[in-house]
């Protein structure tokens, strides 16, 4: 996997990788990350990936990070509770 581009953003670290015929877009915020994959042949070039990182999309990413953080914190707080009988 090789890094092909960093997309500047004031809050997130956005890195684009190329691997196995796909672009892998990794968006990081603190200890969480989201990863999106797209076939290289589906886009005309890396500029299209820049355009995909629009404000509406990144606001949804931020919301998802918030939800992920809440889920993780809840799991962390409850880690000592009796395990589910299905585990």
Annotate each PLM feature.
Residues 1-4, 85-87:
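Short, Lys/Arg-enriched, disordered terminal segments
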Residues 2-39:
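N-terminal acidic leader/helix
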Residues 42-87:
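Mixed-charge, Lys/Arg-enriched low-complexity segments
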């Amino acid at each position: 996997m090789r890094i092909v581009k960093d997309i500047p953003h004031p809050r997130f670290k956005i890195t684009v990788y190329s691997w196995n015929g796909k672009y892998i877009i990794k968006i990081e915020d603190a200890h969480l990350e989201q990863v999106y994959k797209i076939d290289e042949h589906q886009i005309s070039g890396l500029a299209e990936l820049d355009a995909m990182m629009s404000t509406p999309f990144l606001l949804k990413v931020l919301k998802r990070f918030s939800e992920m953080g809440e889920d993780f914190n809840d799991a962390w707080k409850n880690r000592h509770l009796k395990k589910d009988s299905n585990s």
